[in-house]
Regions:
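Glycine-centered loop-to-beta-strand initiation motif
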Residues: 61-72
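Residue-level detector of high-confidence beta-strand sites
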Residues: 40, 56-58, 70
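Beta-strand signatures of extracellular beta-sandwich domains
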Residues: 42-46, 82-84
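Beta-strand-rich domain onsets/edges
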Residues: 5-39, 47, 53
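Short beta-strand and strand-turn-strand segments in soluble, beta-rich domains
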Residues: 50-56, 98-99
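Feature of secretome-associated and extracellular-like proteins
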Residues: 80-122
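Surface-exposed coil/turn segments at beta-strand junctions on protein surfaces, enriched
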Residues: 20, 60-62, 76-78, 98, ...
Length: 122
């Protein structure tokens, strides 16, 4: 009986994984001054086209300081991108001064692999 429950549980977990969209880009923020994740930080994603940046999306970090759902895997996402982390409001909420009003990270996606962009704050 126990084996049946374990098998059913594994089947449900496996099937729920297939039902979810897969994403090519994720990020997270660690606040090393506190030794914890940085939740509720606005992060904007832009793609370079010619000499301009085109907004692709934006999201807030979750309670674990993560965003897991930038750039769906089923499209061609090659190109140069920029993540802009709006950290000043995060520090203001912590009653701290911020040296950086925002942090920009520019990178290039060349294939269909998953890319993860972590940053640390202090």
């Amino acid at each position: 009986m126990k084996n049946i429950f374990v098998t059913l549980f594994l089947l449900v977990v496996t099937m729920s994984g297939f039902a979810q969209d897969k994403f090519q880009l994720s990020t997270h923020i660690l606040d090393i001054s506190k030794g914890q994740w940085a939740p509720n930080v606005l992060v904007q994603l832009e793609k370079k086209q010619n000499s301009s940046w085109i907004k692709v999306g934006e999201n807030y970090t979750d309670q674990n300081g993560r965003i897991k759902d930038f750039l769906k895997m089923n499209t061609s996402n090659t190109g140069i991108y920029k993540l802009t982390f709006q950290v000043k409001p995060y520090f203001e909420n912590q009653k701290m001064n911020s040296f950086y009003p925002f942090i920009e990270v520019v990178f290039e996606i060349k294939d269909n692999e998953h890319y993860h962009v972590p940053i640390t704050l202090s």
